[in-house]
Amino acid sequence: LMTVEPMFIEGKPFTAVTVKLPKTTLLVISNDVGYIMCGALDVDLLNEKLADRNIISGRAVGVKTIQQLLDAPLEKVTNASIAYGWRAGLIGKEALMLIS
């Protein structure tokens, strides 16, 4: 099952995506600038193999719902996201507001 829903954080538009898979759930909250995602995100791949794309992204681990993703600290962020003030430990919602 997959759901794609519009959501607003402090009045700013984002898209929340939930993909239920066997034994795991993929979670993403995005806008036109970047996204935060569950632990399935391979930040190292984005930094090393896709560095030329300057992808703004961060991952939070151990989250099982969109709300948990918003409330969790980011465990790792892409190099490109640092220019937006993102860093490990930044709360997901706060990171999204920095790109809104």
Show where each model-derived region lies:
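Residues that scaffold, gate, or flank divalent-cation-dependent active/transport sites
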Residues: M2-S100
